[in-house]
């Protein structure tokens, strides 16, 4: 006779058919095989002795008098439990079993998702689709659950940029530094199947971040026209009482104003915006002489906060002084002939001299009486020679006011 008052025990283990599934594990297996091992022979253990949550049992079978198996199929994603309560079966001596240690398993087929965000060196957020002149930005990949397997090679970069310094911030976030190599749009993508969660589910959707780097400084050009709308070229001399300057920037700006214009020899007024890249301003000379207009560097910015490059200087000379002309005369011997005098010279050499350069003076501007012009010769832009053949009596040679400019 054998006296036995020891209660049988039972242990629950599991596998996915080829690999063990440990208690508390998370996997994406569609079903697992449970194994129930008793400490001694029993003939009363049945499928009804097993209590489950989050799934159903099937294919219960006795492998031996101490080993039983069953297939557990989850009904939804989430936690599952398998229990064998105390006293549900007995050994040969009629001792009821002790309760099994609960087996816990999490069924997870949900793929992790990811989102890419960014900040600049000051910690300010950089929105996807935005443009800035930051020399570097830090990208953050945040996953919906703990994920592993991410490498810097998983990031796909399209555009002028390189990645460096991949760092694990937490179990659900990693950071990487993006450095632009030139202006333009940069797209950073984490493709599908780049990371996996604890259940080995790979991300199915791509995470994308788009950013444009703008390191180009805006430029500005200055042109001018007069009140009649005629173009006034750089370096020109005119007698216009006012010019209208047009300032054209290479890209949109909102902070260009009258105070950004440097001017000498004139005043500027009536600054107005035609568009985000075009501005007009009136230029009024203070006195006769040279006028210069420019916009110095770092006076305005573009939308990415890049400072402007200095403009080329616009030069204009305001001249309201009428040109004067002096006429002198000599004979063939080089002797001066005074106005109003009487001589017997059969030819007279006139020298016409202006006090400034003239471009539109010709023989037709010379009025004569009682004689004829034998030759008209421009010596320079301010000196002209005339050979005059006089007639008997009073001879005159004159240049009327307004004949040239």
Can you annotate each of these PLM segments?
Residues 1-405:
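Non-catalytic beta-sheet/beta-sandwich ligand-binding modules that flank or precede catalytic cores
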């Amino acid at each position: 006779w054998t006296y036995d008052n020891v209660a049988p025990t039972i242990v629950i283990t599991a596998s996915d058919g080829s690999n063990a599934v440990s208690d508390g594990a998370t996997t994406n297996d569609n079903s697992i095989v449970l194994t129930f091992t008793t400490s001694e022979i029993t003939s009363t253990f049945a499928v009804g002795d097993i209590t489950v949550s989050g799934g159903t049992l099937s294919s219960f079978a006795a492998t031996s008098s101490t080993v039983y198996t069953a297939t557990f199929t989850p009904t939804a994603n989430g936690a599952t439990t398998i229990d064998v309560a105390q006293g549900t079966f007995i050994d040969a001596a009629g001792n009821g079993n002790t309760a099994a240690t609960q087996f816990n398993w999490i069924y997870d087929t949900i793929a992790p998702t990811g989102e890419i965000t960014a900040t600049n060196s000051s910690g300010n957020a950089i929105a996807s689709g935005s443009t800035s002149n930051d020399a570097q930005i830090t990208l953050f990949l945040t996953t919906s659950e703990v994920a592993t397997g991410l490498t810097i090679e998983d990031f796909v970069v399209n555009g002028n940029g390189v990645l460096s310094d991949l760092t694990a911030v937490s179990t659900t976030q990693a950071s990487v530094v993006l450095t632009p190599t030139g202006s333009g749009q940069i797209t950073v993508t984490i493709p599908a199947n780049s990371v996996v969660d604890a259940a080995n589910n790979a991300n199915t959707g791509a995470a994308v971040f788009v950013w444009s780097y703008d390191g180009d400084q805006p430029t500005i050009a200055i042109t001018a026209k007069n009140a009649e709308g005629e173009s006034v070229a750089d370096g020109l001399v005119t007698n216009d009482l006012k010019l209208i300057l047009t300032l054209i920037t290479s890209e949109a700006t909102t902070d260009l104003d009258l105070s950004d214009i440097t001017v000498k020899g004139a005043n500027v007024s009536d600054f107005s915006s035609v568009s985000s890249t075009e501005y007009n301003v009136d230029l009024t000379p203070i006195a006769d002489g040279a006028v210069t207009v420019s916009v110095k560097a770092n006076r305005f910015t573009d939308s990415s906060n890049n400072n402007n490059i200095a403009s080329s200087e616009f030069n204009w000379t305001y001249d309201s002084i009428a040109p004067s002309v002096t006429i002198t005369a000599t004979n063939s011997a080089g002797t001066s002939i005074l106005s109003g005098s009487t001589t017997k010279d059969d030819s007279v050499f006139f020298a016409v001299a202006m006090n400034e350069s003239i471009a539109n003076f010709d023989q037709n501007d010379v009025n004569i009486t009682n004689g004829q012009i034998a030759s008209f010769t421009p010596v320079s832009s301010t000196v002209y020679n005339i050979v005059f053949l006089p007639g008997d009596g009073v001879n005159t040679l004159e240049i009327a006011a307004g004949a040239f400019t």
